[in-house]
């Protein structure tokens, strides 16, 4: 079987590429980032092709803080369309194309004309559903609505219609597609894995402190205001809340209204630095109102750090409530505060949750279960027989 991938930047697609390569399925992965960045993903260069100039330039300009939203929107739209045109010209015949959502429409049609299958890989909820949730949250906090990008919804929905299948990382994401009219039989839930070689326990949380961690984009979509309000209610003489990640523009006008005592913002950290923070934290809290399946949950669990999360994070596909952590309703400040207080006041509970986390991620086999589920889906869609000999990675 020959499988090709298209992806903006990296996301989880290089983990998938490794799984496909080990099974002998990977033909090529096309990315909009340069090889200088992609080589750290550890995939042989012969499998990687890049269309990097436009995306790299847009990213660098964006980091200056001087790129107007309208210009950023135009450049990203241009990048999306030209990347799709480029991959459509370059792609060799294959049995299946896996494209991160937003990419691959023209390329997918070409693959289908040549007898292959086109799979849209969506990392979060349905685009229209997502935009409705985020717009409502902006209104709730008196923040101007997000810059309208109707072309994104139009393109995404055209891709959903064209694709032979849509993969999502969680049941909650699949439900959003069904709510927006996509047939359930077109959807396939394939939860993400975790790199156990990079995320593992390296420290023990300080028993004299209560360290709470948040990791990810620090904005309204991630439910950050609810975490700050809840943390302020936690009673502990030496409590600390650390935010790892970049503060989003939509939160900047809201932050001054929120309690921030004993709160630290570190900015973005490297994966080794993040793993160290996770190992040293008593709990990670992710109160998102919309997501797909937050990778940081599995990463924290692999470090022995219990998780408090909302269903919107995809938590229900990753861990069990009151076993490896706690699942609380979205926007529920009382529930967040109660569960944090529980862990702060009961070291034995925290230890039980931590040990359960390590058992759970070990059972997932890193990214291997993810690869197995993709292997099953690809064989089902293409109808191609499995190799009679098991691949070497199982030996």
Model-based region annotation:
Residues 41, 58-74, 114-154:
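Acceptor-binding helix/loop patch of EC 2.4 sugar-transfer enzymes
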Residues 289:
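Aromatic "clamp/platform" in nucleotide-sugar-dependent glycosyltransferases that forms part
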């Amino acid at each position: 079987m020959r499988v090709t991938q298209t992806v903006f930047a990296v996301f989880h697609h290089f983990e998938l590429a490794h799984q496909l390569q080990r099974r002998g399925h990977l033909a090529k992965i096309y990315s909009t980032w340069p090889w200088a960045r992609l080589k750290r993903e550890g995939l042989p260069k012969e499998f990687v092709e890049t269309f990097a100039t436009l995306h790299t330039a847009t990213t660098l300009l964006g980091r200056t803080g001087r790129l107007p939203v309208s210009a950023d929107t135009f450049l990203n739209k241009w990048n999306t369309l030209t990347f799709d045109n480029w991959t459509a010209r370059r792609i060799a015949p294959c049995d299946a194309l896996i494209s991160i959502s937003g990419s691959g429409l023209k390329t997918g049609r070409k693959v289908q004309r040549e007898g292959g299958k086109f799979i849209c890989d969506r990392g979060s909820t349905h685009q229209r559903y997502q935009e409705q949730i985020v717009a409502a949250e902006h209104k709730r906090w008196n923040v101007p609505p997000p810059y309208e990008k109707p072309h994104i919804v139009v393109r995404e929905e055209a891709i959903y219609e064209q694709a032979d299948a849509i993969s999502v990382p969680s049941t909650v994401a699949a439900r959003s597609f069904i709510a927006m009219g996509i047939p359930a039989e077109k959807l396939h839930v394939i939860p993400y894995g975790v790199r156990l070689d990079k995320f593992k326990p390296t420290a023990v949380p300080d028993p004299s402190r209560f360290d709470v961690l948040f990791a990810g984009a620090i904005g309204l979509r991630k439910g950050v205001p609810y975490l700050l309000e809840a943390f302020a209610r936690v009673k502990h003489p030496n409590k600390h809340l650390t935010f790892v990640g970049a503060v989003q523009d939509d939160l900047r006008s809201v932050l001054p209204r929120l309690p921030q005592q004993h709160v630290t913002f570190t900015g973005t950290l490297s994966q080794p630095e993040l793993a160290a923070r996770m190992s040293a934290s008593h709990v990670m809290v992710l109160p998102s109102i919309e997501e797909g399946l937050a990778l940081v949950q599995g990463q924290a669990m692999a470090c022995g750090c219990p998780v408090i999360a909302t269903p919107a994070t995809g938590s229900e596909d990753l861990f069990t409530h009151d076993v490896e952590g706690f699942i609380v309703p979205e926007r529920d400040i009382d529930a967040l505060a109660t569960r944090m207080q529980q862990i702060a006041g009961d070291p034995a509970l925290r230890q039980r949750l931590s040990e359960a986390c390590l058992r759970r991620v070990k059972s997932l086999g890193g990214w291997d279960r993810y690869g197995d589920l993709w292997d099953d889906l690809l064989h089902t869609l293409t109808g191609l027989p499995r190799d009679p000999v098991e691949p070497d990675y199982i030996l």
